[in-house]
Amino acid sequence: WKQNQTIKSSVQDSQKIISLNCGIGLLELNLDQEIVAIDEKRYQIDDAKLNAKYLKKENVTFIAGDLDSKIVTYAKKKVYDTLIIQNERYGLSDTIKDTIKIAKFKTIIYACQSHSTLAKDLADLEKNYKLERIIGLDTSCHNSYLTTIVKLVRK
């Protein structure tokens, strides 16, 4: 809940959002902007679509598929001002990094549980983006994970 509220407050000025690793869409269904939410796990996208239907949320499009190919497809179709990345441990692929450079998102919100992965990806992203805010959240009191949420803005 804390993570979703923190991200929600960071995208208030956004109009169109792409969200990667959306899971069952808990964050995306709490936002009012136009959103394309992508996850590789079809069963989670199926649940997200059911939740959207039940909640009558028509602003979110949930897509199941390979993150690399889907972000390229959607970034070419329309201009999005914000990218949300919810990453547990794995870093961003070269395809996603290249798409970020080409799409020129105004804002990137990156939530990650692996500090080494986050540091590596930030080193690449900081070539075109400025670190505006970093927040650490204890999102699970029963383990030692700390979720770090970073807000980057285009230079």
Positions of predicted regions on the chain:
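Rossmann-like S-adenosyl-L-methionine
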Residues: W1-K155
